[in-house]
Structure formats: structure tokens, C-alpha cells
Amino acid sequence: ALPLPLIHNMSAVAFIDMMEKSKVLEPKYCRELKDKLVYFFYGKPSYVINTHNYGNAGDFYAPVCLLFDPKKVAIHKAFPFDTGGFLKRYIKANIYGDFSLKEFELDNTYENICDYIRTYFGSNINYYLGKRVWGDKVSRTEKIHYCLLNMLDSSLDDERVRTIEISSKFACGLR
């Protein structure tokens, strides 16, 4: 599988503000991971639509997806789901056990991420669609990981549980 683009999601109002100021996506402090990071989803957009809109905000909060070349973004950490949702226990699978985030961390190379997609999804298309596959040539450790990840496929969870999250410590400029 070839590397897919990285996608950063933001609201339209945040995008307009950034474009008027610096045209640079700057690392922001993450309380959960206690570091300044820029977050991306690997290969597909993933965001939650605000269902608690108590007024007409127009298009201010419409999602904007920025695409980045993976060769130009240094990976700090990679996880097979949205870490914020996991740590805030929005991902319902975490009710089955007190798993630490570290147990799910992927090696931070694009080669490893492509291997992960081949192992658990079979292809980039299946990954994009969120369709897991079960390969018969996986190791015991991979089977355990697959079972843990399979819990994340609960219908109670949204698309962020099937999307690889990548963080970087470096700013990303826009053309």
C-alpha cells in the first residue's frame, strides 16, 4: 500500500483565521498528551459534527479538511484511533478494560503504518471504508491487537475509532 495523504480537520472559522494570520498550522498544547502537537488523520477525514448547535452558526463551523504530503510531515506518534476520544473515554471499547494508550501506539514510520493497514484492513480502500479483514498469517501479538481493536468496532463508536491518528511536533505551512 502506498502512503496516503495526511488530513487535518478544522472549522471554517479557524481556517479563515489561520489563512488571514500566518498560513501555518502551528502545534497546539494537548492536555491529554501533555505536549505541543499538530494532529492529522491518515488517509481520510474524520470528524464529529456538532449536534448541539443551539442557534444558526451558518457555515462558521463547517468542516475544512487540509491535505498534506506524508513525506513532508515528521511523525511524532501514531495510533490506530483518535487518542482524545480514547483518553476521554468517548470510545466505548475502553469500558471493557483499562487499556493504556501506550498499548496501542504504532511505530512512527509510514512503512509501519502501511504494514498495519495491510495486516488489519488488507488494502487502502478497505481502510478508507473502515472494513477490517482477518488475515490467517498474523502472529499471536497481532491477534491480541486485532481482538482489542475489534472491540473498537462497536456501533456505539464513530468513524474516529477506525482512523489512524498521527501527531507531529512541527508546524506545517500552507501554500
Regions found by a protein language model. Give the residues of each.
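Short, conserved catalytic/metal-binding motifs centered on acidic residues
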Residues: 43
